[in-house]
Amino acid sequence: MESGAENQQSGDAAVTEAESQQMTVQAQPQIATLAQVSMPAAHATSSAPTVTLVQLPNGQTVQVHGVIQAAQPSVIQSPQVQTVQISTIAESEDSQESVDSVTDSQKRREILSRRPSYRKILNDLSSDAPGVPRIEEEKSEEETSAPAITTVTVPTPIYQTSSGQYIAITQGGAIQLANNGTDGVQGLQTLTMTNAAATQPGTTILQYAQTTDGQQILVPSNQVVVQAASGDVQTYQIRTAPTSTIAPGVVMASSPALPTQPAEEAARKREVRLMKNREAARECRRKKKEYVKCLENRVAVLENQNKTLIEELKALKDLYCHKSD
């Protein structure tokens, strides 16, 4: 671009100089004659202007630059136009559609290959095995998993009377007595008590206490009858602490309650399974009947086609025999 600007400036200067020289030549009284015109090819280039030699009548030689300039390259450049190929998008869509069609055809072939043939269905119908597998009865949760029963060992409470005797009440209702001065094992005396059922609050519960000699004594439930080794019978009253005074570290354990109606739940589930089996068997029989009817219709059509073909064959044979005769 800088070289083009310089060429344009030199051309303008040459035109100005030529115009001034022409005006000078016209001012002379005599018209100048063209004596010699030389255009040296060796020095002429695309960038240098053409030089003309003009000889005046007085013998003076003047160099005149040519007015016609060679075509210079244009400084203005044409903007570049960017073309976008839309065919590539169309090709990508076509390729995607072709891939989808190939995938659909593969899936269709797989589905057709998985369909059972008429021979296989006919064999299934002729066999005695049921077409629909029966739903096996599941074992109820009550039968499979038995409830876990936790055994909790409760420590035996021991009471000491004012006379120094120890009283231990076991779970079975037996009362063991031991004196303070005797051995714990040899001095034990057992009283068997039969507990009565709980009644309304405010009533006194009586229970039998059996001594070592076989005698039975009727005493209230909150009293203990103790017979000493000497034969004296003493009565002690047991006071139970209220539930609110239980120590915070005591844990009350209770066994889990068994299900109240396991048999009814199992029977209901069994009825539901049997009903589902009956519905499945009914549907299977209906489908078998429809398929057999379809096969019978197809057999009838094939028999008619076979009869028609046999008749056409006979007609062709008769026609061939007549032509041969």
Curated annotation (Swiss-Prot):
Location of the Glycyl lysine isopeptide (Lys-Gly) (interchain with G-Cter in SUMO1) covalent cross-link? K269, K288
The UniProt entry's GO CC annotations, sorted and at most eight, read: ATF4-CREB1 transcription factor complex; nucleus
Q: Which residues carry this modification: Phosphoserine?
A: S117, S126, S255
Q: Where is this site: Required for binding TORCs?
A: R298
Q: Which modifications occur after translation, per UniProt? A: Sumoylated with SUMO1. Sumoylation on Lys-288, but not on Lys-269, is required for nuclear localization of this protein. Sumoylation is enhanced under hypoxia, promoting nuclear localization and stabilization. Stimulated by phosphorylation. Phosphorylation of both Ser-117 and Ser-126 in the SCN regulates the activity of CREB and participates in circadian rhythm generation. Phosphorylation of Ser-117 allows CREBBP binding. Phosphorylated upon calcium influx by CaMK4 and CaMK2 on Ser-117. CaMK4 is much more potent than CaMK2 in activating CREB. Phosphorylated by CaMK2 on Ser-126. Phosphorylation of Ser-126 blocks CREB-mediated transcription even when Ser-117 is phosphorylated. Phosphorylated by CaMK1.
Q: Where is this cross-link: Glycyl lysine isopeptide (Lys-Gly) (interchain with G-Cter in SUMO2)?
A: K120
What InterPro entries does this protein's entry cite? Answer: bZIP (IPR004827), bZIP_sf (IPR046347), CREB1-like_pKID (IPR003102), Leuzip_CREB (IPR001630)
| Predominant location | nucleus
The KID domain extends over: 85-144
Matching CDD domains, A to Z? bZIP_CREB1
Domain bZIP as annotated: residue spans: 267-325
Q: Name one GO molecular function term.
A: DNA-binding transcription factor activity, RNA polymerase II-specific
Query: Which keywords has UniProt assigned to this entry?
Result: Activator, Biological rhythms, Differentiation, DNA-binding, Isopeptide bond, Nucleus, Phosphoprotein, Transcription, Transcription regulation, Ubl conjugation
Give positions of region: Leucine-zipper: 295-316
Instruction: List, in alphabetical order, the GO biological process terms annotated in this UniProt record.
Output: cell differentiation; circadian rhythm; negative regulation of apoptotic process; positive regulation of DNA-templated transcription; positive regulation of fat cell differentiation; positive regulation of lipid biosynthetic process; positive regulation of transcription by RNA polymerase II; protein stabilization
Question: What family classification does the UniProt entry report for this protein?
Answer: Belongs to the bZIP family.
Summarize the subunit comment.
Answer: Interacts with PPRC1. Binds DNA as a dimer. This dimer is stabilized by magnesium ions. Interacts, through the bZIP domain, with the coactivators CRTC1/TORC1, CRTC2/TORC2 and CRTC3/TORC3. When phosphorylated on Ser-117, binds CREBBP. Interacts with CREBL2; regulates CREB1 phosphorylation, stability and transcriptional activity. Interacts (phosphorylated form) with TOX3. Interacts with ARRB1. Binds to HIPK2. Interacts with SGK1. Interacts with TSSK4; this interaction facilitates phosphorylation on Ser-117. Forms a complex with KMT2A and CREBBP.
- Do you know which PANTHER family this protein is assigned to? CYCLIC AMP RESPONSE ELEMENT-BINDING PROTEIN B, CYCLIC AMP-RESPONSIVE ELEMENT-BINDING PROTEIN 1
The protein in question is named: Cyclic AMP-responsive element-binding protein 1
Q: Which organism is it from?
A: Bos taurus
